[in-house]
A protein has these predicted regions:
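Catalytic-domain carbohydrate-binding cleft regions of carbohydrate-active enzymes
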Residues: 3, 8-246
Length: 246
């Protein structure tokens, strides 16, 4: 039995100010007052994970408020980094840099690797005998050395989306990274599934899709279900006694 928490620091917090004092916060999102999706929307940005001092400080903040209290597994979402969804290339360049190493266009794809390094090295420095576990939405070559697992992101909830995970997982494994997973059932749910009524063809299909996806997930390195409404617990997919479970 465990718990999950989502923590997002606004630019008004002490954590932000500490990293900003190092010159290690991307500034464009602050200048443009970009708000995240958590109600009512907070203005914030990402830290420069390419800066070794910023990585050290990032872990110190995590250690002080989380790891030292017994939290020892990490789910790092939006680690592309995804400062804002669906931006054009030029604006994305501005949102994600400049980095400590140079222009964002040259180093952008390695952000998840550097962020994982911050957490792995930081936790090991505090307790070298404690196993590190990090789940991240993005990956880069070599990240397995940081005890990192990756899932395939906010995928759709269609049959073709489930099919696409087969090749995605195989390609990931062939890249030398053993721990890969996906959102069983898909993450971004079609409206017809969300509005489906008991006895409808859409609800029957939703249950069948989840049934097959759970079966597929049982053979993946990590078994996890996650996504938007409807609820994803196995017992919430269908009522007791449903053919879905047979």
């Amino acid at each position: 039995v465990g718990s999950e928490m989502c923590i997002r620091d606004s630019y008004t917090t002490e954590h932000y100010k500490e990293l900003d004092a190092l010159g290690a916060m991307y500034q464009q999102a602050i200048k443009d007052s970009i708000r995240d999706w958590i109600y009512p929307g907070y203005i914030g940005s990402f830290y420069d994970a390419y800066n070794p001092e910023a990585r050290k400080l990032f872990w110190e903040q995590m250690n002080e408020h989380l790891y030292s209290l017994g939290i020892d597994a990490w789910w790092m979402d939006a680690s592309e980094p995804n400062v804002q969804d669906n931006t054009d290339i030029e604006y994305r360049k501005a949102l994600c840099g400049p980095t400590y190493l140079g222009p964002s266009t040259k180093y952008f794809n390695a952000y998840a690797l550097e962020n994982a390094e911050a957490i792995y090295d930081g936790q090991r420095s505090v307790n070298p005998d404690d196993r590190v576990f990090l789940l991240t939405r993005s990956g880069f070559a070599g990240q397995q050395r940081y005890s990192t697992a990756t899932w395939s992101g906010d995928i759709g909830t269609r049959w073709e989306d489930m099919k696409a995970q087969i090749s995605a997982g195989l390609n990931f494994a062939m890249s030398g990274i053993p721990y890969w997973t996906m959102d069983i059932g898909g993450f971004s749910v079609e409206n017809r599934y969300m509005a489906a009524k008991e006895g409808s063809e859409d609800l029957r299909e939703w249950r069948e899709l989840n049934n097959r996806w759970y079966q597929f997930g049982a053979f993946c390195p990590l078994f996890r279900s996650h996504g938007q409404y409807p609820c994803r617990e196995i017992y919430n997919i269908a009522p007791e006694g449903s053919p879905t479970y047979q």
